Amino acid sequence: MAKTLYQKVFEAHVVYEAAGETPIIYIDRHLVHEVTSPQAFDGLREKGRKVRRTDRTWATMDHNVSTTSNDINASGEMARVQMQTLMKNTDDFGVPLYGLNHKWQGIVHVMGPEIGLTLPGTTIVCGDSHTATHGAFGALAFGIGTSEVEHVLATQTLKQSRAKTMKIEVTGKVGPGVTAKDIVLAIIGKTGTAGGTGYVVEFCGTAIQALTMEERMTVCNMAIELGAKAGMVAADQTTFDYLKGRPFAPKGADWDAAVEYWSTLKTDAGAKFDAELVLDGAAIEPQVTWGTNPGQVISINTPIPAPEDFADPVARSSAQKALEYMALTAGQKLSDVKIDKAFIGSCTNGRIEDIRAAAAVAKGRKVAPGVQALVVPGSQQVKAQAEAEGLDKILTEAGFEWRLPGCSMCLAMNNDRLEPGERCAATSNRNFEGRQGRGGRTHLVSPAMAAAAAITGHFVDVREL
């Protein structure tokens, strides 16, 4: 029987399935951070349990960390407690920790791939909703709750129902100035934020195959934003070239055997998907969200829609509330919308290619008066690479702030946040009310579009700069 990529990876990890029961699957990689792990480790202590596979578990600090100081106290008392608790827990249970001063510290979904923890055909979980990022490698990766974190720590397994399958094909070739972020925002604009609920999505098509690994990570990162359990891209030569030689990637004969196996992990001809969607890559333009969920998105040159444009009453009501919260009006041009802040970073767009894209726009230009623009590398490795290339100098000379790695302004869990009423061009993944700070207004864009907005002081088509 012909199988999809998802079905192949899932079935390879079923360790037990009783009749009428939810399957139990094996977990190959468990990534841990400071926010969703404390209660899980406490649960192990209370029951006298150990971490079953300390060699399959890795921890880092990212959500709470300060991006201006390596001082553990710099982000406030709650952050200090969570980070110190992670240090104690990883020490007590023998779990490797890439802490504030470690060369591999960074956002968990940036760190994992760049050191070779993320491999095709593996199952990967983390107590974080954007774990789908790792699906770019042909892995089955998804976020879990804290009780499930405890279960994986104790057993290295998880009860997991089979998901429905969805194929999203992006055909053709995208034009200049159109990025992976624009592709995935355009997809979510078509599906809405619930279109993928109950599905694992496989992204495919010539426009997807043409993406670099970092670009594929951006696409899979936001699979959760269309409601999907996970997003996947089949591994290919681009994947193998990215992984070869990374610290945790197989070596020598093991590498050859791994590539041979990984090459079988693709959807068979004739395999049936439960749902399919096709987008024309050439028709995608730079995207900007206008509302309070990622599905409320339009191309930069499209006027902001009116609530009455939506046939569905729920969508109509949501649009009305979004316009009020965002202080926008139907028919308004995005180019007329001024910003207060720009944020370039996050697990969606905090990698070296993202920093390069922002620097290319910033070079020889200046941040607009009254705009604060932050560039936050996704990891210590990204930071070091960017500095080796002189990108930090280009950005700071243009008036951008060059920060230390962390989740930063993606979410209001550290010192980087919006004040009420402030408007931000952000390369992160969520534009919910208050996501970047109480009363803050978030517009999701690509790194190049965020840099362009920072320089002009308002949203602008980066292709016209």
UniProtKB/Swiss-Prot annotation:
Protein name: 3-isopropylmalate dehydratase large subunit
Catalytic activity, EC: 4.2.1.33
Known role: Catalyzes the isomerization between 2-isopropylmalate and 3-isopropylmalate, via the formation of 2-isopropylmaleate.
Pathway: Amino-acid biosynthesis; L-leucine biosynthesis; L-leucine from 3-methyl-2-oxobutanoate: step 2/4
Native species: Tolumonas auensis (strain DSM 9187 / NBRC 110442 / TA 4)
Cofactor: record remark: Binds 1 [4Fe-4S] cluster per subunit.
HAMAP family, A to Z: LeuC_type1
Pfam families according to UniProt: Aconitase
Keyword Methyltransferase: no
InterPro entries membership: 3-IsopropMal_deHydase_lsu, Acnase/IPM_dHydase_lsu_aba_1/3, Acoase/IPM_deHydtase_lsu_aba, Aconitase_4Fe-4S_BS, Aconitase_4Fe-4S_dom, IPM_dehydratase_rel_enz, IPMI_cat
Subunit structure: Heterodimer of LeuC and LeuD.
Similarity section: Belongs to the aconitase/IPM isomerase family. LeuC type 1 subfamily.
Catalytically driven reaction(s): (2R,3S)-3-isopropylmalate = (2S)-2-isopropylmalate
